[in-house]
Amino acid sequence: MVATSKQTTQGYVVEAYGNLLRVHVDGHVRQGEVAYVSVDNTWLKAEIIEVVGDEVKIQVFEETQGISRGALVTFSGHLLEAELGPGLLQGIFDGLQNRLEILADTSLFLRRGEYVNAICRETVWAYTQKASVGSVLSRGDVLGTVKEGRFDHKIMVPFSCFEEVTITWVISSGNYTVDTVVAKGRTSTGEELEFTMVQKWPIKQAFLEGEKVPSHEIMDVGLRVLDTQIPVLKGGTFCTPGPFGAGKTVLQHHLSKYAAVDIVVLCACGERAGEVVEILQEFPHLKDPHTGQSLMHRTCIICNTSSMPVAARESSIYLGITIAEYYRQMGLHILLLADSTSRWAQALREISGRLEEIPGEEAFPAYLASRIAAFYERGGAVKMKDGSEGSLTICGAVSPAGGNFEEPVTQATLSVVGAFCGLSKARADARRYPSIDPMISWSKYLDSVAEILEKKVPGWGESVKQASRFLEEGAEIGKRIEVVGEEGISMEDMEIFLKSELYDFCYLQQNAFDAEDCYCPFDRQIELFSLMNHIFNSRFCFDCPDNARSFFLELQSKIKTLNGQKFLSEEYQKGLEVIYKLLESKMVQTA
């Protein structure tokens, strides 16, 4: 991707501030347009971010060393776009959609000015023709399909085509590369169009054709604390703020491995390179618990680590959501994981500072909240013209400095998401993983999930509320115990405290390194939760706090052992019987 003869508009550099250049332009340009800056016989990709008269300000996505006043700049005439088509899955891209495995063949380090196609032009795909000559199609309608892994990848009329098209020619089913013309059409104005398997779309514009509908399906992630206390629906939005070391990245890795969705798009925008390397090493060897295939078969990774240019962080998060929206249009369920949106916000702050804009709180731009809201609004469930439904669930990790949830990025995020999974440093230090604090977390989807599960598990919603009440009461009693000791509280309060601790240790906490406990399917969660509710509704007889504590510790040990056993195995059934017998030995009555 370099300047071509079609790029007639040119300019020259007037001034440079880091990766921000002020350029005098001879011709017509528009905000968001892609430009190329000439330096050392290479072309550096850039984007127009401000237009003032005959001058523009552009942010360069590469190291700007060597750029001098008067350097030639050419403008492409098109916006910053994503290349969309078969072959994106299993791909590893940078923020500009360069395939990193191809760049790795040329050099150990990323050389500036090197750009490669996101979709391989040599790969042959088995194309099945669906459209017929004479049919009238519009944007998003299916021309044909190719098999991409286990998915039928729909080749659609480009979304940049806003007119109805009458198909005049179609190719027969067979094996073709992505640049092969698979159909031709004519618009109402007589314009002739050719369609290939690849289309492009500006990454900063929402990619949508169809009707947005309310979310009505639970996204099972295999984490009991999320599925029970802070559930999320497919097409919902949630965030995972937390201080450094609280386990945000590990939580996102778990979601990418076990979430019950079709495709996961992982945006590592600004996180440490070591964490990205860990993903690249682990994922090809991990199995998807839902299909048994490699996790990479359903994953697309955009790597933009903190060591890469700041400007590319912004493009990486928009690139990720554009790819996710593209697959949603095929009727698939997508999960987008952005780690971390704080780094993206810091990139916005840096660019805003160089543009000399009036700063908002903590020097972030005044439009930060609207940018974050616009990003999360691109999620949701969509009903297509053919009646199929797809969804895009967005999870954004937030890294507030010092774990301060009052800072602007966290507050702007909380105002637009449907669920808040707050990670606590205190819980992480106490080794209570996942360190999601149920006392500060919340979900707007609780009632919707309760309504869905009511048919399968009567009283689910009330049971979850009861568990939350026990947690709140237990936390209050725990604070009193720290002040007056166990002797200063009643036996009834002691029992409530121990029940809340048991629920925390045995239900909310999970061992990510245990083969069984790392992923808890919904049927298993329902059975364990019914056991917890049986304990909540039971009264026990104890002589003193020590006896009560020893009983609940024994109970905790047996339930922890049960969590590590294969579900419905002989050992599991025996362990469950032992637990119920132990409960009966101390039980006074059931409420």
Curated annotation (Swiss-Prot):
InterPro entries, alphabetized: ATP-synt_VA_C, ATP-synth_a_Xtn, ATPase_a/bsu_AS, ATPase_F1/V1/A1_a/bsu_N, ATPase_F1/V1/A1_a/bsu_nucl-bd, ATPase_F1/V1_b/a_C, P-loop_NTPase, V-ATPase_asu
Pfam families per the UniProt record, alphabetical: ATP-synt_ab, ATP-synt_ab_N, ATP-synt_ab_Xtn, ATP-synt_VA_C
GO process annotations (BP): proton motive force-driven plasma membrane ATP synthesis
Binding site for ATP: G242, P243, F244, G245, A246, G247, K248, T249
Molecular-function GO term, any one: proton-transporting ATP synthase activity, rotational mechanism
Keyword flag S-adenosyl-L-methionine: no
Domain of life of the native organism: Bacteria
EC assignment: 7.1.2.2
HAMAP family attached to this UniProt entry: ATP_synth_A_arch (MF_00309)
Role played: Produces ATP from ADP in the presence of a proton gradient across the membrane. The V-type alpha chain is a catalytic subunit.
Protein name: V-type ATP synthase alpha chain
